[in-house]
Amino acid sequence: MVPPRRHRGAGRPGVLSSSPPFRLRSAKFSGIALEDLRRALKTRLQMVCVFIMNRMNSQNSGFTQRRRMALGIVILLLVDVIWVASSELTSYVFTQYNKPFFSTFAKTSMFVLYLLGFIIWKPWRQQCTRGLRGKHAAFFADAEGYFAACATDTTMNSSLSEPLYVPVKFHDLPSEKPESTNIDTEKTPKKSRVRFSNIMEIRQLPSNHALESKLSRMSYPVKEQESILKTVGKLTATQVAKISFFFCFVWFLANLSYQEALSDTQVAIVNILSSTSGLFTLILAAVFPSNSGDRFTLSKLLAVILSIGGVVLVNLSGSEKSAGRDTIGSIWSLAGAMLYAVYIVMIKRKVDREDKLDIPMFFGFVGLFNLLLLWPGFFLLHYTGFEDFEFPNKVVLMCIIINGLIGTVLSEFLWLWGCFLTSSLIGTLALSLTIPLSIIADMCMQKVQFSWLFFAGAIPVFFSFFIVTLLCHYNNWDPVMVGIRRIFAFICRKHRIQRVPEDSEQCESLISMHSVSQEDGDS
């Protein structure tokens, strides 16, 4: 057996051996392996962190939408309570002072109190004192184009997309090595390095929402640019006044129709016909949608029909005096329901976001225009004989003022805010909740007993309100249409012949590809 050949000087003392370089090289390889392992573990941890952050962010965005919906529902329920108390006070006033036009005019004119905000609220005064529109005409032209694009967008998301966290992949640059290997590495100064985050946040900006990116590149002073940014998202006082001028007539006619119906017809008939505002809102919102929550679905239609059926049962349980129905009062009720639906659908289409419109300023101008433009109606109604002008006594006047401040000024502001937070259909269906609540108030305060029809009708009214809320919350989910499609697909299904695994002749190729290739080669 031949011994292995040894290198010269191998194993001798005082002579350089070749084993230390091999050890250094193996140590270097092991260090590289440990570094790769450390980087792999770090990448895995980053991916876990990214998953957790994205999950939390999606939950937060869903929580924000749920919080808006919950706040809107609470506000609408509070409005129902206020309206029930207001209706009780209105019934007392009509027993002593049956003047629908005067009552509606007085309550609507109280909206002028909101215009005191120009004295108290500084941003409102700045819109009048500062010439922003003349000074920055081009800027506001871009802003109007931006908001016009927003108005045509039917989606709820009018800002940046939800953040997405992605790990950053740094490309390692080749390290600079010294030319001479004899230079001592300990004497070379260490270069200072900057640590960057290993996770980057990505947000996408829609093309029609790119005004903010243009504002960030403008050369205005910081304070001036900040003030413009605060006011550009809001409608100016002139624009709010124009919107109020149009909607003041619709709102006044809707309330006047309801008051006239109450004076001509029984309350039960008025409430039954007024509940059709939900149906008018559903139809108008489908024709003139303001957002994705106003899309027409079959489930919403059935919920509205369910609500109307419940209202009919509730009113039948509350009163049996239905023999003296007046046709004029029924027409007034239907007109009021239709005008109320036009009012809420058109204003949501005109103003797509609640932060774009100053709701107190809007109602303030509504009261101002009603006070300035509709006072000739007293002379017209007085000389035609429809309603004689008569000033009320102190008690009735105090009741009208209290009812106007709480039941009209405050409640209309809260109701419109709740409609912006939820949807126009939910806001109109919330009106139907006042009927069972008013009957409950009569049971508690006046000790009135109702039949089983009341309870049979109150349950559908409450259920329809919360059903539509859930349908709008879950992105216009239409379970009724889904069920109909599945039933139709089940009935119209075709019996298909399924392949049996044991039938080998069905899987056998009729033309052998190998034989075909051989014939092509021979030819």
Swiss-Prot record:
<comment type="function">
    <text>Putative solute transporter.</text>
</comment>
<feature type="transmembrane region" description="Helical">
    <location>
        <begin position="452"/>
        <end position="472"/>
    </location>
</feature>
<keyword id="KW-0812">Transmembrane</keyword>
<feature type="transmembrane region" description="Helical">
    <location>
        <begin position="101"/>
        <end position="121"/>
    </location>
</feature>
<keyword id="KW-0597">Phosphoprotein</keyword>
<dbReference type="GO" id="GO:0016020">
    <property type="term" value="C:membrane"/>
</dbReference>
<comment type="similarity">
    <text>Belongs to the SLC35F solute transporter family.</text>
</comment>
<keyword id="KW-0472">Membrane</keyword>
<feature type="transmembrane region" description="Helical">
    <location>
        <begin position="243"/>
        <end position="263"/>
    </location>
</feature>
<keyword id="KW-0813">Transport</keyword>
<keyword id="KW-1133">Transmembrane helix</keyword>
<feature type="transmembrane region" description="Helical">
    <location>
        <begin position="420"/>
        <end position="440"/>
    </location>
</feature>
<feature type="transmembrane region" description="Helical">
    <location>
        <begin position="395"/>
        <end position="415"/>
    </location>
</feature>
<feature type="domain" description="EamA">
    <location>
        <begin position="252"/>
        <end position="316"/>
    </location>
</feature>
<feature type="transmembrane region" description="Helical">
    <location>
        <begin position="327"/>
        <end position="347"/>
    </location>
</feature>
<feature type="modified residue" description="Phosphoserine">
    <location>
        <position position="207"/>
    </location>
</feature>
<feature type="transmembrane region" description="Helical">
    <location>
        <begin position="69"/>
        <end position="89"/>
    </location>
</feature>
<feature type="transmembrane region" description="Helical">
    <location>
        <begin position="296"/>
        <end position="316"/>
    </location>
</feature>
<feature type="transmembrane region" description="Helical">
    <location>
        <begin position="361"/>
        <end position="381"/>
    </location>
</feature>
<protein>
    <recommendedName>
        <fullName>Solute carrier family 35 member F5</fullName>
    </recommendedName>
</protein>
<feature type="transmembrane region" description="Helical">
    <location>
        <begin position="268"/>
        <end position="288"/>
    </location>
</feature>
